[in-house]
């Protein structure tokens, strides 16, 4: 399956062939030849949207295949048009990139690791393995918003193994095989499978 969200997180519509469709506990389970729907994972919620005339209500990855949960069936072999709920996706991209910026700055300054985070409609929560005073958070907020104002490029690459072994990065160092590294210059270098904005300015604002 071609995971189009790794080609570009800004793909909003696509066409693909229906490979399988079966009824399950959460509705119909559909796999495609390619998809731009991001499956829940790495702290980021799943995309929603439309496949043809059926609604995609959830997306998960199983055994390397992205499974789309829908409210109706689609014929196997049919070409179908997918449309991402872009407002939802872009908010997740802003939140995820903002979380990287904050987590990276806190790791740099205090050595604390992000041990969990949750993206919500109105707020994002991040858990660290250390205590931060309010003044510390205000300093991080100021630094993060300064870097947002700089509109820094955010990159996602798959380094070669020798390059990866020599790289200093946050999180998921136990991963083997191809590892995707998301970088914000001066802010964060982290292994991540999620979708991100192209530049820090698109995060908008960090506010504790």
Positions of predicted regions on the chain:
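A glycine- and charged-residue-rich anion-binding loop/surface
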Residues: 1-208
């Amino acid at each position: 399956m071609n995971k189009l969200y790794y080609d570009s997180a800004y793909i909003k519509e696509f066409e693909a062939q229906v490979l399988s469709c079966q009824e399950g506990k959460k509705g119909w389970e559909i796999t495609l030849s390619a998809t731009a729907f991001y499956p829940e994972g790495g702290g980021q919620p799943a995309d929603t949207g439309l496949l043809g005339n059926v609604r995609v209500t959830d997306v998960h990855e199983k055994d390397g295949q992205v499974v789309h949960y829908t409210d109706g069936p689609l014929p196997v072999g049919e070409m179908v048009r997918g449309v991402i709920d872009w407002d939802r996706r872009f908010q997740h991209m802003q939140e995820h990139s903002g979380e990287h910026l904050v987590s990276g700055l806190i790791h740099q300054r205090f050595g604390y690791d992000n041990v969990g985070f949750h993206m919500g409609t109105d707020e994002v929560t991040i858990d660290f393995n250390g205590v931060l005073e309010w003044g510390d958070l205000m300093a991080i907020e100021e630094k993060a918003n300064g870097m947002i104002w700089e509109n820094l490029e955010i990159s996602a690459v798959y380094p070669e193994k020798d390059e990866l072994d020599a790289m200093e990065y946050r999180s998921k160092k136990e991963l083997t095989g191809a590892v995707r590294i998301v970088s914000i210059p001066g802010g964060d270098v982290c292994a991540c499978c999620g979708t991100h904005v192209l530049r820090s300015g698109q995060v908008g604002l960090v506010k504790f």
